[in-house]
Each structure stands twice: as C-alpha cells, then as structure tokens.
Design a protein with these regions (language model features):
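Conserved Class I S-adenosyl-L-methionine-dependent methyltransferase catalytic core
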Residues: 8-16, 22-54, 63, 69-187
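Alpha-helical subdomain
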Residues: 1-80, 183, 190-364
Length: 364
C-alpha cells in the first residue's frame, strides 16, 4: 500500500502512550456529545468570545443569552474536550489552540456544518448501509435512490452545507488545475459531472477559445443553467443530460474532445461503475485526447489530518450518497484506469485542499 511520508510515520507503528490511547478511546466513545457541544460553542459564538477576551461562566451566559447552567455545562465539557482553557486564579475561560481552529479554519467549519446538516442523523443507519450496500441513512433527508437525484430538493440547510462542502474542496484547487489542463490550449472540454457549472465558468473565463460541454443529470443541468445564466462565456457552455449509472448511456461524441475533465466525480461511484464510466470515456477519446481526473486521494496527502478527514468522508458515501463508493486510494484508482484500457500519463499532487490530478491517455 502506498502512503505518503507523513502518513507512513503515523500509520505503520504505535505512536501513543497508553494513557493517551485510553483517552482517545473515551473521546471516541463520547464522540456524539463532543461534536454537539463543540458545534454549539461555535454556533452561539462562545469560542469567538473567548478568543477575544477571558470570561467567567456568568459573563459567557450573559453574552450568549443562555442560562448560567447551560454555560457551565458547555464550558466544563469544552475544558475537558480541549477547546478552552481555565485561569485557576480568576476562574476565567479562554480559547485553546484547538478551539481557535474550530472558529478560524475554513475546512473545519465546512466539515462541521456538513456533518451536522447532512450526515449526523443518517449515521444511525451506517450499520445497515455497510451490510446491505445501500445508502440507508439517506431516508433522513428524502426519498431518493442516491443523494445526487435529490440535490435540488434537499432541505435548505442540508443543501446549503452540501454545496458549501463540495465547492470548498474543489474551488480551492481550480487555479492550479486550470494551468495544468490548459497547458496545451484545448479548444473542446467535456466536464463530466459538472454540477452547477463553477468549473465550466472558470474555463471559459480562463480561455476565450474553449467550448465546454457539461455532462450531468438533467435536474443538475437545470440548476447549472440558472447558475451560469448571463455570466461571461456562458454562450460557450452547453449541457448534455444523461444518467451514467445506466451503462447503456454513452458520453457525447458529437465533436472531437481535446480534454475530458472529471472533478470529485469518480468518488461518487463503485469500482465496477468507475470502470464502466472510464470505458465510455475511452470510447470517445483518441490518441490526442487527455482525461484529467481530480480527486482527494487519501494516501497522497501531505498532512495527516487531511487523510483522517477523507477516510471519514468515505462513510458519507456509504451511508448517505449512494451506498457503494468512497474516497479512493490511488492504487485502486490507477488499477481501475488500467482495466478501462487507459494509462496514467502523469500525477500532480498537493493542489489546493489536498487534491491530486491524474492525467490519463488511451493505451496504444
């Protein structure tokens, strides 16, 4: 198994003393409470208050407009969680380094909202999802076979957090990705799974000569047209509606494709489905076409916390999204690329929030 240098140091030998290991075990056992306490400390602005000044329990209660009892419960729990510190001489609380990250780190805030609004209730059904290979927790949000079919109908907060999560991770890599994809000045680009058209808009803005075709579900294309309407370059963006879960549905072949782009797309499918999709991509490629696959591959992360986040996100796919996909290890994705009759030309690592781009060509 390939692991980046930092992950190899963390995951191949024991690193915790016994007492620290025991504490982590208890942290896991109380995980739901730890999460909700910390979420409320953020939502009610308490950590932000303690970032700016030391406060007593009574002062926190007054500023947050909660009871002294509620403030005491939250602050004592947060003290043992590790998000606040206490000054013994004055009985005043202040924020810790961990608390600071909860307030100020954009990735942490996005992850917290996503887990509460999209995942939390559904995770009660994770056991069924793992045993049955279906998104058993999705019923907490709506009655669809996959979350993608229901994106336009999700409850407001869930939809907001879902798109914020998706856009945060992809958008942070777009600037570097554009330089890679447009190095050979493509004129035609197929964006498979283009969602709301954010990447397509960046492409037509980046190069005035490129034409983009977004391939996605018809309901997603309707959202895309709303998002791109009247935007600069929108006249060079077209949609192709299809459901790629149906293996009889081919990718568009009405023009020669210089580039095929799949960003955070293949992680939405099982291994068998990925091979099928890649074979259909290969069918519309020639020797000059390049397929760019952008994914957050957990094994290639520079920093260990990113790998932790990604392997946990895999269970969102299991329980909420579709029941059979995950955040893939690069070894697995490379193997599937080969099974589809394609070969890896180059891999670019450490883009944005930990993305990699796999540049793929047809086997000769």
């Amino acid at each position: 198994m390939y692991l980046s240098e930092s992950l190899e140091k963390k995951y191949t030998k024991e690193t915790l003393p016994a007492r620290d290991a025991q504490r982590l075990a208890e942290f896991i056992a109380f995980g739901p409470i730890v999460f909700q306490v910390s979420r409320l400390m953020v939502k009610w602005g308490i950590l932000e208050m303690l970032r700016d000044e030391e406060l007593t329990i009574e002062e926190v209660a007054r500023k947050a407009d909660i009871s002294v009892y509620a403030a005491k419960c939250l602050l004592e729990a947060s003290l043992t969680i590790g998000t606040v510190l206490i000054n013994k001489a004055t009985d005043r609380f202040t924020i810790s380094k961990t608390g600071w990250f909860l307030v100020n780190d954009p990735a942490t805030r996005v992850n917290m909202d996503f887990n509460h609004d999209v995942n939390y209730l559904g995770m009660f059904d994770l056991e069924d999802a793992l045993k049955e290979g279906r998104p058993a927790g999705l019923k907490r949000l709506g009655n669809w076979a996959t979350v993608y079919e229901g994106l336009s109908q999700l409850p407001e907060e869930a939809q907001k957090s879902w798109f914020a999560f998706d856009h945060f991770y992809s958008d942070s890599s777009f600037e570097e990705a554009l330089k890679i994809v447009f190095a050979d000045k493509p004129k035609t680009l197929m964006d498979v799974g283009g969602n709301t058209g954010r990447w397509a808009l960046r492409c037509v803005d980046y190069d005035p000569n490129v034409n983009v075709t977004i391939v996605d579900l018809p309901q997603q294309l309707a959202m895309m047209r709303q998002q791109t309407e009247a935007k600069t370059g929108a006249d060079r963006i077209e949609g192709f509606g299809t459901n790629l879960l149906d293996e009889t549905n081919a990718l568009p072949n009405h023009r020669h494709w210089d580039v095929i782009w799949m960003s955070q797309f293949l992680d939405c499918f099982s291994e068998t489905q990925i091979v099928s999709i890649l074979k259909r991509a290969a069918a519309v490629m020639d020797n000059d076409t390049r397929l760019y696959i952008m994914e957050t591959l957990w094994d290639r992360q520079r920093f260990e916390p990113a790998a932790f986040c990604l392997t946990q996100i895999s269970l969102y796919f299991t329980d909420i999204a579709n029941g059979n996909s995950k955040m893939y290890h690069s070894d697995d994705l490379i193997r599937l690329i080969g099974q589809a009759g394609l070969s890896v030309d180059e891999i670019y690592d450490h883009l944005g929030q930990g993305h990699s781009i796999i540049k793929v060509k047809k086997m000769k």
